[in-house]
Amino acid sequence: QQSIFTLWAPSADNIRLNLYSSGEAGDPEEQLEMDIADNGTWCIHIDRDLKGSFYTFQIEKDGKWLDETPGIWAKAVGINGNRAAVIDWNETNPEGWESDQSPELKMYSDIILYELHHRDFSIDPNSGIEHKGKFLALTETGTKTPEGESSGLDHLKELGVTHIHILPSFDFATIDERKLEKNKYNWGYDPKNYNVPDGSYSTDPVTPTTRI
């Protein structure tokens, strides 16, 4: 087993890889110097399986070590997105994912578009949706309000909606995922990790694979 880390940072003087056992607190268990490679990249090969570990990159420039970063290409992170995570991607795909296909669209003029915010869509106490404010709310069917009216996806189908435009789903900065009970709100236009789903919409922001 081998783990390979690569970072493009052509202006760096040195780069180190910080390895952690936690996605949130604690000092690094290891700090490893990376080697300069081709085309402005830095790389390190570690001869063991690091699944379950967390990591950051840290750049030295002009004698000063800059703040740690998970890297802009991180696809899995710990709580609040400060540390990237090493995961097994085979564990993230739901059943049937590889064979899933979108419906055929014959004419763009057939589109009836609905803009949707993950939290707003389901957070109302009377939505009848179990996973209020979460990604999973978009998987629930058969939900109803106390008055018996359809809610969630069923309501959109009744409206004749064919396509949903979802507001930012990526990991954004202003919601503290440790304090979701504070009910803080944001549309999501303050990106932190572009390639990671936001933890506040996950049922477990601590576990990297849960939000994916």
Name what the model sees in each region.
Residues 1, 28, 36-141:
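The feature marks proteins involved in alpha-glucan
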Residues 3-6:
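Structural beta-strand segments of beta-rich domains
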Residues 8-15, 50:
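Short proline/glycine-enriched turn/loop motifs at strand-loop junctions of beta-rich domains
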Residues 16-18, 58:
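Beta-strand signatures of extracellular beta-sandwich domains
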Residues 18, 119, 167, 197:
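Conserved residues at the C-terminal ends of beta-strands
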Residues 118-120, 124-125, 131-149, 154-165, ...:
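Phosphate-binding active sites in nucleotide-utilizing proteins
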Residues 127-144, 176-212:
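Aromatic- and acidic-residue-enriched carbohydrate-binding clefts of CAZyme catalytic domains
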Residues 156-183:
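Carboxylate/His-rich catalytic cores and anion/metal-binding grooves
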